[in-house]
Amino acid sequence: MATQVPTKVPQDPDPFYYDYDTVQTVGMTLATILFLLGILIILSKKVKCRKADSRSESPTCKSCKSELPSSAPGGGGV
């Protein structure tokens, strides 16, 4: 009896195959960009509200203080 050798059927590429090196590189790049963007946002808010001179207030500091409910005249309690 002769046995037949199974023929190889060409398979379609697996749609769930990931190039993990590329996924890791893109993920780390996005994480770094978002991290640096967050640091810049935090630092920009601190620099904007910092007083340059104790005798005069800049207009940016007045706008920052108006956002805080506790700095309103008369106590500003809720």
Curated annotation (Swiss-Prot):
Regulatory subunit of the sodium/potassium-transporting ATPase which is composed of a catalytic alpha subunit, a non-catalytic beta subunit and an additional regulatory subunit. The regulatory subunit, a member of the FXYD protein family, modulates the enzymatic activity in a tissue- and isoform-specific way by changing affinities of the Na+/K+-ATPase toward Na(+), K(+) or ATP. This is FXYD domain-containing ion transport regulator 7. It is found in: Cell membrane. PROSITE patterns: FXYD. Residues 1-22 are extracellular. Belongs to the FXYD family. It comes from the Eukaryota. Keywords: Cell membrane, Glycoprotein, Ion channel, Ion transport, Membrane, Phosphoprotein, Potassium, Potassium transport, Sodium, Sodium transport, Sodium/potassium transport, Transmembrane, Transmembrane helix, Transport. It comes from Bos taurus. Its main location: membrane. GO terms for cellular component: plasma membrane. The gene is FXYD7. The keyword Ion transport applies. Residues 44-78 are cytoplasmic. GO terms for biological process: monoatomic ion transmembrane transport; positive regulation of sodium ion export across plasma membrane; potassium ion transport; sodium ion transport. The chain crosses the membrane at residues 23-43. Glycans are attached at residues 3, 7. The transmembrane domain is important for the interaction with NKA and with the functional effect of FXYD7. GO terms for molecular function: sodium channel regulator activity. InterPro entries: FXYD_motif, Ion-transport_regulator_FXYD. Associates with and regulates the activity of the sodium/potassium-transporting ATPase (NKA) which catalyzes the hydrolysis of ATP coupled with the exchange of Na(+) and K(+) ions across the plasma membrane. Reduces the apparent affinity for external K(+), an effect that depends on the presence of external Na(+) and voltage. Increases the apparent affinity for intracellular Na(+). It is a single-pass type I membrane protein. O-glycosylated; required for stabilization and translocation to the plasma membrane. The modification Phosphoserine is found at residue 71.
